């Protein structure tokens, strides 16, 4: 993961947070252990940082004079077995949950933090999300600028095997599967879903 965070002139310390209160969870359960190899840069200069000893989801980064942005680089280690947590990535499918693989600056309402998301998918994969303004260049996908709150509420489903049904009313059903034969749906089931949209 690579994330660029602008900094105001004169900033000497930037605190970045990994979300701990996640949509659909009833407690502070952000997957901190899945964030590894965390590094920060201003240009080519590697920056010093430390994790807060009390607020463990906070990372304090020392910002050099004149820096206009800080680049965070890290790896999100998705669970490989169900005993490690929900499996969200396989060789054929992806459920990209932004809140588990992004940081945000402390001291701001998340609905006011502007972001421009970009993802590079494996060749031939198709993405689906509630984000607006999708454009593709090869296997690189970019969406229109949005706020961090909307980003977190807009996971991406993508996969090698993908199918989409128009349910009417500007509503689509997007399906990804491990195998192409698993993409099928009975016409009567699609009709029921279309009826729900009409209701």
Regions of interest found by a model, annotated:
Residues 16, 26-27:
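Short linear S-[DN]-x-LW-Φ motif typified by the pepsin-like aspartic protease active-site region
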